[in-house]
């Protein structure tokens, strides 16, 4: 079959704490498989209050380094693959304004929806977790 774009826009890094390998390893594996576009979309950091630290996402402080690292690799591999950097995000109203400002400030390429929590990670159930609700 021809005419289809070989791309992946849902790639996590070690910063989300549940992915393994380096960005470089992901890029080189994608190139070997004929992928022409690769998007990195770590879970968007949340400006949690009260010192809460997520086990599934980077901190707000890690976001600039994440974007910088992907941009630098994009320059290095420009002749082999097109790289994009963005975030996978839930829509949580209490965080959205600050997250959108960070996204704009860092010059990210895209954001994908991944609504894993119905409320904040701190206060709502994970959508894949069984509950006692009827």
Please annotate each region the language model reported.
Residues 36-43, 108-118:
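Non-cysteine beta-strand/loop elements that form the S-adenosyl-L-methionine
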Residues 119-134:
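Active-site-proximal loop/helix segment associated with metal-binding centers of metalloenzymes
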């Amino acid at each position: 079959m021809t005419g289809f774009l070989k791309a992946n826009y849902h790639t996590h890094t070690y910063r989300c704490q549940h992915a393994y390998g380096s960005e470089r390893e992901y890029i080189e594996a994608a190139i070997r498989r004929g992928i022409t576009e690769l998007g990195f979309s770590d879970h968007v950091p949340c400006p949690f209050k009260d010192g809460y630290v997520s086990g599934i996402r980077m901190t707000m402080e890690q976001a600039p380094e994440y974007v910088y690292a992907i941009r630098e690799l994009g320059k290095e591999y420009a002749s082999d693959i097109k790289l994009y950097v963005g975030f996978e995000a839930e829509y949580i109203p209490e965080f959205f304004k600050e997250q959108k400002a960070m996204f704009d400030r860092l010059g990210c390429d895209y954001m994908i929806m991944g609504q894993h929590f119905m409320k904040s990670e701190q206060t709502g159930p994970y959508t894949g977790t069984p509950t006692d609700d009827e």
